[in-house]
Amino acid sequence: SSDSTGYFELACEVPCTLEFSHVNYKKESYTLKDTRSPFIVILRNKFNNLREVVVTGRSTPGRLYSSKEGIEMIPAILGEQDILKYLATTPGIITTNALDPGIYVRGSNSCENGFLTHDMEIASPDHLTGILSTFDPFILNNSTVYKSGFPAVYNSYLSSYINMRPDPGNKQKYEGEITLGLVSSALKIKGPLVRDHTSFAASFRTSYLQTIARLYNKSVKDQKQQNFMPEYAFNDATVSIDSKLSNRWRVTAFGLFTIDGLSMKLNENVNYDFNWHTFSGNAGAWYTPANGDILHFRLGVKSAFSEGDAEGTIPMGGGNRNYSIIARIMYTHSFLDKFQWNIGGKFEQARFETANRPDAEENILI
């Protein structure tokens, strides 16, 4: 043991042998015969000769996977689980705050991420105000995220691609759940349409923020004051169908529909209304010949509609609508158990429309 000044005290019967050692120094032994005589111990440097060291490393692939188990491990924001919140916990992906559903991959913008289901792009990943994403993990809980090294079949986005695989449902029995959150509630169910053959999974979510806001606005005594609460409501429905026609054929379908509405009353004479609707749907089939090759073709559609109206001293309004039709076909052949080649094609037609509100000549487009 040592005292407060760092001096060691050792107890032993004389004569005794003391050993002194330290990292990078040679061990020294000293035989103590007389405790009254001081002595000095000098440790000599020890040289460790190492053989050549080769350090190797492999580049980390810019691809990761998400699962239902991983999503359930993160805290629920406003009582809702979210696949994008889970992705924000992985390396290279962040979000600005807990109420922002967007993700930022390696410093890029959130609008530079492509969201797909079965390799088909969807209309919009989040609701109007950005509180929550449109993805319900009850159905959309497995995905492949490409942060770099994008496959050649993807284009148009710079940061990442999130390809989600909808839950096929349960072909044996029915199961479901009802969730109650701080801002919304949902009814979820999955089960067989044809037992052992065709299954489905469906989720319907609605908010009650607008009800709280309406009750508050009715309680405002002075309707001329600008202290009204915005009345915001969102709804979404997600449906997935999976059917195994035979050992060679498999058919799937997916649909996602959202409705958002925001009403802001500044005073008794001025009111703003915004509406936002989106729809994404696709259906496709896989054919697997006896040699293990895969033929996959898919048809999809996506659309988004927004409309705004302002009632007051200067009424104005407008809206826009865009939609796309996409068709894809791909053939995959594997050989030597390690290599595969893909060949395919893609067709897409898109249209964007915008217009003023037709009932007033002085309206300006917003």
Can you annotate each of these PLM segments?
Residues 1-52, 95:
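Periplasm-facing N-terminal accessory domains of Gram-negative outer-membrane beta-barrel systems
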Residues 26, 37-39, 59-150, 161, ...:
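Periplasmic N-terminal accessory/gating domains of Gram-negative outer-membrane beta-barrel systems
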Residues 60, 110, 120-122, 167, ...:
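Structural signature of outer-membrane beta-barrel domains
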Residues 74, 130, 174-176, 225-230, ...:
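Outer-membrane beta-barrel domain signature
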Residues 81, 156-158, 181-185, 233-235, ...:
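Residues that define the transmembrane beta-barrel architecture of outer-membrane proteins
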Residues 85, 104, 161-163, 177, ...:
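Outer-membrane beta-barrel architecture
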Residues 114, 142-153, 159-167, 174-222, ...:
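Predominantly transmembrane beta-strands of Gram-negative outer membrane beta-barrel pores used
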Residues 242-260, 275-366:
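Face-selective signature of the C-terminal outer-membrane beta-barrel domain
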